[in-house]
UniProtKB/Swiss-Prot annotation:
HAMAP family: ClpS. Binds to the N-terminal domain of the chaperone ClpA. GO terms for biological process: protein catabolic process; proteolysis. This is ATP-dependent Clp protease adapter protein ClpS 2. InterPro entries: ClpS (IPR022935), ClpS_core (IPR003769), Ribosomal_bL12_C/ClpS-like (IPR014719). Involved in the modulation of the specificity of the ClpAP-mediated ATP-dependent protein degradation. Disulfide bonds: none annotated. Belongs to the ClpS family. Pfam families: ClpS. Gene3D superfamilies: 3.30.1390.10. The gene is clpS2. It comes from the Bacteria. SUPFAM superfamilies: ClpS-like (SSF54736). Residues 1-24 are annotated as: Disordered. It comes from Rhodopseudomonas palustris (strain ATCC BAA-98 / CGA009).
Length: 109
């Protein structure tokens, strides 16, 4: 037969290997939200902030507040970047609205 390269008979099926690769997802970086001590913000206000923005109960909020008072800084929680940034902004705006100099920052864990 012309055009078949001189072969006759059925064509042989080709085989191929298909490999499935699972996409690897990278875990997002985590950030610590920290409250800084100052000499002017009342302890009760700090406890209120911890309850309101970090869903702490009174005991946990008081424990964190006392740690901030004695050590100058305390961790409120660990979050992804967007959540940490939002919480810092909320705390700073709330403190400013109530005329307190409370400072809240975030740092990469």
């Amino acid at each position: 037969m012309a055009g078949d390269g001189g072969r006759s008979g059925p064509s042989t099926p080709s085989t191929s290997v298909i490999t499935k690769t699972k996409p690897r997802t990278k875990r997002p970086n985590l950030y610590r939200v920290l409250i800084l001590n100052d000499d002017y913000t009342p302890m009760e206000f700090v406890v209120h902030v911890l309850e309101k923005f970090f869903q702490m109960d009174v005991e946990a909020a008081t424990k964190v507040m006392l740690h901030v008072h004695h050590h100058g800084i305390g961790e409120c929680g660990v979050f992804t970047y967007e959540i940490a940034e939002t919480k810092v902004t909320q705390v700073m705006d709330f403190a400013r609205k109530h005329q307190h100099p409370l400072q809240c920052v975030m740092e990469k864990k």
